[in-house]
Amino acid sequence: MIVYVLVGLSAFCIVLYLISQGQSDCVVLITGESVRVQGCRIDGEFGSVLSKLKPFGCGSFRS
């Protein structure tokens, strides 16, 4: 019984480690005033989507 628990815990730790290594630091921050892209590799399709993004501007008094 203890062997199964140790094997399961070991497998969980290995999978968690592998998942955390595959993450990138790509951040798309959309606020009311701007759209910021940080740390992203921009290819053709992602670039076309980014060009269409606009700030929310819900609370803006601008006309």
Curated annotation (Swiss-Prot):
<dbReference type="InterPro" id="IPR003411">
    <property type="entry name" value="TGBp3"/>
</dbReference>
<feature type="topological domain" description="Cytoplasmic">
    <location>
        <begin position="22"/>
        <end position="63"/>
    </location>
</feature>
<protein>
    <recommendedName>
        <fullName>Movement protein TGBp3</fullName>
    </recommendedName>
</protein>
<dbReference type="GO" id="GO:0044167">
    <property type="term" value="C:host cell endoplasmic reticulum membrane"/>
</dbReference>
<feature type="transmembrane region" description="Helical">
    <location>
        <begin position="1"/>
        <end position="21"/>
    </location>
</feature>
<keyword id="KW-0916">Viral movement protein</keyword>
<dbReference type="Pfam" id="PF02495">
    <property type="entry name" value="TGBp3"/>
</dbReference>
<comment type="similarity">
    <text>Belongs to the Tymovirales TGBp3 protein family.</text>
</comment>
<dbReference type="GO" id="GO:0016020">
    <property type="term" value="C:membrane"/>
</dbReference>
<keyword id="KW-0813">Transport</keyword>
<comment type="function">
    <text>Plays a role in viral cell-to-cell propagation, by facilitating genome transport to neighboring plant cells through plasmosdesmata. May induce the formation of granular vesicles derived from the Endoplasmic reticulum, which align on actin filaments.</text>
</comment>
<keyword id="KW-0812">Transmembrane</keyword>
<keyword id="KW-1133">Transmembrane helix</keyword>
<keyword id="KW-1043">Host membrane</keyword>
<dbReference type="GO" id="GO:0046740">
    <property type="term" value="P:transport of virus in host, cell to cell"/>
</dbReference>
<keyword id="KW-0472">Membrane</keyword>
<keyword id="KW-1038">Host endoplasmic reticulum</keyword>
